[in-house]
Swiss-Prot record:
A molecular function GO annotation: magnesium ion binding
Pathway involvement of the protein, from the record: Carbohydrate degradation; glycolysis; pyruvate from D-glyceraldehyde 3-phosphate: step 4/5
Enzyme's top EC category: lyase
Enzyme Commission number(s) of this protein: 4.2.1.11
Name of the protein this chain belongs to: Enolase
Localisation per UniProt entry: Cytoplasm; Secreted; Cell surface
Physiological role: Catalyzes the reversible conversion of 2-phosphoglycerate (2-PG) into phosphoenolpyruvate (PEP). It is essential for the degradation of carbohydrates via glycolysis.
GO terms for cellular component: cell surface; extracellular region; phosphopyruvate hydratase complex
Swiss-Prot/TrEMBL GO biological process terms: glycolytic process
Cofactor names: Mg(2+)
Organism: Leptospira borgpetersenii serovar Hardjo-bovis (strain JB197)
Gene designation: eno
Length: 432
């Protein structure tokens, strides 16, 4: 180990995220002055098996959501453990923090403290190596730009409207490159705004920059998006595919063991009936991906869904897998889902995130790298998506700087990669 790449100083602070809530930011400085900074995101609809975000619980500050304890853990305990360690040895750095925490869910030091440090160390190491982060993590083979899943209509927990599913997304698969895909998405976003205005519907945007109009049903949300795609001059299916994030744990009634769809007149569905409901949507509309179609504990339902649609469309586990190796391997063995959503703060360290991506790839599951509803200007996930050739990224709509920052970083990466950059479009769903 060269003395130069040793960690000299770690400094954390409390900053504000895109929802006005506090979050953790960490700065790491190495002996040679190399510097890395990372800010941690936070979710609205959280899986019950996620790593724990440490919040202060002091109602006098930020309604109990302060993160001064997590900040102190970084500045004192984590700094003590990591000072003098080699920043180039990411696995060791992360393992030292995990050992010091000692819990299964990072509840002692806080996943926000550990993750902020983990990402900042990687950034400082990349700076030291004179490499962009995607190249430092992914080596010379990192060159695939992800197909963006753009969340242009919000419902569920992300919006105050009558739509059950949390996200309705567009995927610009007909584009030649990322830059063109981003433009297509932006044009559809703008034409959706005018379609909604024409129907005298609200065009204010939600947490992730999508519209949250008060539509009468889930199907109506799909229909207005199809209108917007055509109005923008594109063809559904050929140019743009659709994706849903049902976030069904949010409308699952545990006591009745039923799924209650408010937008469908509070109709109750069994797991099998909900699977049929999805199959019907997929047969009618150009839907290529459904995330969290069933509750995170409804493994039987997930099995049904996978048997029925697993060869046709991408079935993404988010709350189901929570970016966790144990959960994912259970899914792989049970033949459940065929894709995993990757959220760095669900697992809470860079090396564990990369291990989950690796395991998914080996099992021929696709990877979707994702933001959270509470974001910052941090663009690490853009680099992780390219570093791992994940093929897909989910980072919100075409408005709000907390979302756009990620897209703009991908534009810069694509430009830097030049002719070696790859954008796979429909081919990204290689396992269907």
């Amino acid at each position: 180990m060269s003395h130069n790449s040793q960690i000299q100083k770690i400094q954390a602070r409390e900053i504000i995220d895109s929802r006005g809530n506090p979050t953790v930011e960490v700065d790491v400085t190495l002996m040679d002055g190399s510097f890395g900074r990372a800010a941690v995101p936070s979710g609205a609809s959280t899986g019950e098996y996620e790593a724990v975000e440490l919040r202060d619980g002091d109602k006098q500050r930020y309604l109990g959501k302060g993160v001064l304890k997590a900040v102190e853990h970084v500045n004192v305990k984590i700094q003590e453990i990591l000072k003098g360690q080699d920043a180039l040895d990411q696995n060791r750095v992360d393992q030292l923090m995990l050992d010091a925490d000692g819990t299964k869910n990072k509840g002692k030091l806080g996943a926000n403290a550990i993750l902020g440090t983990s990402l900042a160390v990687a950034k400082a190491a990349a700076f030291h190596s004179k490499l962009p982060l995607y190249r430092y993590i992914g080596g010379n083979f990192a060159r695939e730009l992800p197909v963006p899943m753009m969340n242009i209509i919000n419902g569920g927990a992300h919006a105050d409207n009558n739509v059950d599913f949390q996200e309705f997304m567009i995927l610009p698969v007909g584009a030649k490159n990322f830059r063109e895909g981003l433009r297509m998405g932006a044009e559809v976003f703008h034409s959706l705004k005018s379609v909604l205005k024409g129907k005298k519907l609200n065009t204010a945007v939600g947490d992730e920059g999508g519209f949250a109009p008060d539509l009468t049903s889930n199907v109506e949300a799909i229909e207005v998006i199809l209108q917007a795609i055509e109005k923008a001059g594109y063809k559904p299916e050929k140019d743009v595919l659709l994706g849903l994030d049902a976030a069904s744990s949010e409308f699952y009634d545990k006591s009745k063991k039923k799924y209650v769809l408010g937008a469908e007149n509070n109709k109750e569905f069994s797991s099998a009936e909900l699977v049929d409901y999805y199959a019907n949507l997929v047969s009618k509309y150009p839907i290529i991906t459904i995330e969290d179609g069933l509750d995170e504990n409804d493994w039987e339902g997930w099995k049904l869904l996978s048997e029925k649609l697993g060869k046709k469309i991408q079935l993404v586990g988010d709350d189901l897998f929570v970016t966790n190796i144990e959960k994912l391997s259970k899914g792989i063995t049970s033949g459940v889902g065929n894709s995993i959503l990757i959220k760095v703060n669900q697992i809470g360290s860079l090396s564990e995130t990369l291990a989950s991506i690796e395991m998914a790839k080996k099992a021929k599951y696709t990877n979707v790298v994702s933001h959270r509803s509470g974001e910052t200007e941090d663009v690490t996930i853009s680099h992780i998506a390219v570093a791992t050739n994940a093929g897909q990224i989910k980072t919100g709509s075409l408005s709000r700087t907390d979302r756009i920052a990620k897209y703009n970083e991908l534009l810069r990466i694509e430009e830097e990669l030049g002719k070696s950059a790859v954008y796979k479009g429909k081919e990204t769903f290689y396992n269907l």
